[in-house]
Amino acid sequence: MSSLTMAAAQQVGVEAKIDSVAIMIGEQAHLQLAITARQGAKIVYPHYKRSQYLVPGVEVLDDSKGDTAVVDGYWSVKKILTLTSFDEQLYAIPGITVKVDGKSYKSNPVALKVI
C-alpha cells in the first residue's frame, strides 16, 4: 500500500471509472480511482504490481502513482490502473478499498467486458 498524508476526512469520496466498458482480447482499459479528502488526512490506497490480477482474468499492466491537486481545501488524488485480459468474459471488478485517517472507504464496482 502507498501512503500519502492529506486531508482530515470529514467528507471523503472514492470513485472508480473505467474508460471502456468493452475491449477486445489483449487490448487495454484504464480504471481511474478518484479520491477526495480534506487537506491533512492520511490516505492509504492499494498498490498493484505488474502482472498482478485485479480479479481472476483481469491483469494489471501498470499502476500509476497518485496524481494530486488541491481544490477548495480538499485533496483530489487520481490514480490510474492499466488493465488487460486474454479471456472473453464479462468481469465484475469490485469496489477498491482506500483508507482515510484509518477508516476504510470503498469505491463503486465497475464492469469490463472482454470480447
Model features per residue range: what roles?
Residues 7-115:
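Surface-exposed interaction/ligand-binding surfaces
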Residues 1-3:
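Bacterial N-terminal signal peptides
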